[in-house]
């Protein structure tokens, strides 16, 4: 990461510029749609055109996945939230919803990353494995909320409005689908882009993450 000063003189973190050299391809937005809702919530709906996604779930929660499976990538776009419901991103998830869940509270300025998976031996009470990984605060700003979600090997990073908010290393999920979730909310994403990265091959990985 790189330490810079924002417009008000506050020190902020920006993504390591070296990631630009690792981009392997930029996907055509048409390859990312249509969206797939995987929880079967009857109150959920989604309409997507290349680069723009409209998602809604009036009651309960729904996960909306983009097309394709990815391991190392950078997903970017502008997010708009209608109402006071909850929303966020999911990454490296399977069709059952096991993977990483990133909740975003744009009103309180709170980002939370969790690992979420089914626990077949947990019975009714412990049917899901739920592990908080990291919580971070950020400065609430007016819309649009510009986001960039990066996954490279074990390294995961979220930037909002061009500044790094959350960063950690975790190896529970290494590949899967990417998307969004809405819970009692309407969500719109514009300018959606997806870059894929070359896979880490260094024998020192993930120790090399210390320099990012």
Label every model-predicted segment:
Residues 1-212:
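Extracellular glycan-recognition regions
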């Amino acid at each position: 990461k790189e330490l810079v000063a924002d417009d008000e003189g506050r020190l902020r973190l920006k993504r390591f510029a070296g990631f630009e050299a690792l981009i392997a391809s930029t996907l055509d937005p048409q390859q990312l749609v249509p969206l797939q809702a995987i929880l079967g919530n009857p109150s959920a709906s989604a309409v997507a055109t290349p680069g723009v996604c409209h998602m809604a779930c009036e009651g309960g929660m729904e996960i909306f996945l983009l097309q394709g499976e990815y391991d190392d990538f950078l997903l970017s776009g502008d997010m708009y939230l209608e109402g006071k419901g909850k929303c966020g991103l999911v990454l490296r998830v399977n069709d059952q919803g096991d993977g990483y869940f990133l909740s975003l509270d744009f009103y309180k300025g709170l980002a939370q990353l969790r690992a979420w998976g089914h626990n077949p031996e947990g019975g009714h009470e412990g049917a899901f494995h739920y592990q908080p990984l990291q919580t971070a605060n950020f400065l609430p700003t007016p819309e649009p909320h510009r986001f960039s979600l990066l996954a490279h090997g074990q390294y995961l990073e979220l930037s909002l409005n061009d500044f790094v908010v959350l960063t950690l290393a975790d190896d529970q999920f290494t590949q899967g689908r990417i998307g969004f979730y809405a819970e009692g909310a309407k969500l719109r994403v514009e300018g959606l882009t997806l870059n894929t990265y070359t896979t880490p091959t260094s024998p020192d990985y993930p120790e090399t993450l210390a320099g990012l």
